[in-house]
């Protein structure tokens, strides 16, 4: 994005400074910026960050922008007839796989469609181990991977529609549902237990190194890695041309609601235009940059070729450039994506990420995990789902 800002600046004569944050939720930095009165003209965060800013009256309505009709209204954040976010890309997550390594180890052809259930996955893991791949899968230890990407599958896979997941988290918040009683929770965490059993980092799971996981998948030392298409950024450093990679749904025994066929995925990294700390001239420049990304060949190439993103806009004809992105793009084109929940509290991934780390590290059992998740949601006050 820094390169994109520089390229756009060279064309327009304007200056767009890109500020990045380290680890942790964007909500902390965004809140600090507003408290200091120096929020930037463009804010990229998680969807809950945009929702919070909209509630505070900080975001500009973007429905008048030309890109709105080409995907903005479909993938952006809409509220009360207004559009408040620019969808930078579509992202999907699940089990990343190295088909080349799997087939080499098995000595036969393999297709992800044959591995749908947890039982199928267990059988495949055992076959890979027998073929010499001692630990076929890698799990990350980061809180965002565990809570924002795996745990959230439980909410998102309650049904096909956004409202199914939104209503479920509200049921958790009002106490009418307990997560440990939920069939999807049981199914996904049966699989998570299996992933832990065959985890390449199982000797010290909380010391797992993200870059090492990427290298291991790219080089065929492991067959699977729970992650998303963004993992290509690290994988590409070790990737050998001709290696077949892709993303498949997390196999599980509960097949209801297309759980064995659909990927978790939605618009990611939404961008809003601030109206509280930025004047009309700054807002106009911000809008021009977004228009450049969505509506010019150069901007499109930044998204697809330089950033390896999956564009959310129908007018962009550039195709995904790697196997991970192609898997997600195909699922999106076929309508096989579970929509992402909008109303997560800003501390969801950090708080429940710590809980998930305890579970991954063997410090708590499944019952204790469920109780901590229930206790977290019991503290949340969510507006009724309209």
Language-model region placement:
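Extracytoplasmic/periplasmic substrate-recognition and gating elements
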Residues: 6, 103, 108, 198, ...
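Short helix-initiation/N-cap motifs at beta->coil->alpha
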Residues: 20-29, 48, 116-121, 203-218
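Extracytoplasmic/periplasmic solute-binding protein
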Residues: 84-88, 93, 120-177, 222
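Conserved N-terminal structural module of periplasmic/extracytoplasmic solute-binding proteins
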Residues: 1-51, 58, 254, 354, ...
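Glycine-centered hinge/linker elements that transmit conformational signals in sensory
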Residues: 123-125, 166-206
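Conserved C-terminal helix/tail region of periplasmic/extracytoplasmic solute-binding proteins
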Residues: 132, 311-317, 330-386
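Hinge/lid segment of periplasmic solute-binding proteins
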Residues: 46-103, 122-124, 149, 247-248
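Short helices/loops that flank or line small-molecule/ion binding pockets
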Residues: 27-39, 56, 101-102, 122-132, ...
